[in-house]
Amino acid sequence: MLNPQLNRHGELIHLLSTEGLPRRIIEQILDLAATFVPAPGQEFPKLPLLHGKSVFNLFFENSTRTRTTFEIAAKRLSADVVNLNIAASSTSKGESLLDTIANLSAMQADLFVVRHGASGAPYLIAQHVAPHVHVINAGDGRHAHPTQALLDMYTIRHHKGDFNQLTVAIVGDVLHSRVARSDIHALTTLGVPEVRVVAPATLLPEGLAQMGVRVCTDMEEGLRDADVVIMLRLQNERMRGALLPSAHEYFKHYGLTQARLALARPDAIVMHPGPMNRGVEIASEVADSGQAVILDQVTFGIAVRMAAMSLVAGVRP
């Protein structure tokens, strides 16, 4: 089966999901990102790699961090950036998604960064753009968020070096989390021997065992001796029905406190894709501790998105 993310030479042309993404491509993105990360106290480099190219940020769902970091990344690569106000756009007036893409392509778009509430929307767009136009998925429904997963992998590699002896715990609302799915695919591809998914039964999707993870409904069991703890927020906006008694009850059983973190390895790192709900999935004492590398994730996210845009466009330093 052909991989829609790669051309016939096996080169990355769209970044749609970490599922099916070869290890060599993931490592290529991480290695290139490392060349973009500034030294402490320095700014991100300004490079001419996408000079003359137009990057269209199409966010059909609200976002602050992701849209902003994509915009910064594109500008650091000297691209022209267009941020489309979807709420005021023609899609809200009845124009189809593909008609919108066709019209924007006629404006000489070279790269679409797409966030959409419908799973698979970036795939659909990638199937209908011209060969010289590229698509990066910035999050689609519950399905995938590949650049978040890649910046998570970069953060883990930066702090832990190797993947092949790690135990990684992903904790929280896995049912609604595209980040969890993308992280699981990336972690297993990179050879992490034990990936644990920790959540109440009502927030666990079906089919996790087939993804090669260990499922835990007990927080203490899931955290014990973990090297990396990735916390997920409760996505109340995607919940239908009473999946949880209350946020207070959730924190009581699944919130990451200092006492619970002590079950992990002493040098464990704590990650979170943001935005954080302090006092719901994570205690402030943990979020503000030396073990939390959440702000590193934000910084590395710019470099990883610079790398992803460069590679899909077929350019590199």
Swiss-Prot record:
Indicate the segments annotated as coiled coil, or none if absent: none
In what pathway does it function? Pyrimidine metabolism; UMP biosynthesis via de novo pathway; (S)-dihydroorotate from bicarbonate: step 2/3
Q: What is the annotated role of this protein in its UniProt record?
A: Catalyzes the condensation of carbamoyl phosphate and aspartate to form carbamoyl aspartate and inorganic phosphate, the committed step in the de novo pyrimidine nucleotide biosynthesis pathway.
| Similarity annotation | Belongs to the aspartate/ornithine carbamoyltransferase superfamily. ATCase family.
Some GO term, biological process aspect, for this entry: which one? amino acid metabolic process
Quaternary structure (record): Heterododecamer (2C3:3R2) of six catalytic PyrB chains organized as two trimers (C3), and six regulatory PyrI chains organized as three dimers (R2).
Species annotation: Bordetella pertussis (strain Tohama I / ATCC BAA-589 / NCTC 13251)
Q: Which domain of life is it from?
A: Bacteria
Q: Which reaction does it catalyse?
A: carbamoyl phosphate + L-aspartate = N-carbamoyl-L-aspartate + phosphate + H(+)
- Show the InterPro entries listed in the entry: Asp/Orn_carbamoyltranf_P-bd, Asp/Orn_carbamoylTrfase, Asp/Orn_carbamoylTrfase_sf, Asp_carbamoyltransf, Asp_carbamoyltransf_Asp/Orn-bd
Q: What is the protein named?
A: Aspartate carbamoyltransferase catalytic subunit
Q: Write out the residues that bind L-aspartate.
A: K93, R178, R233
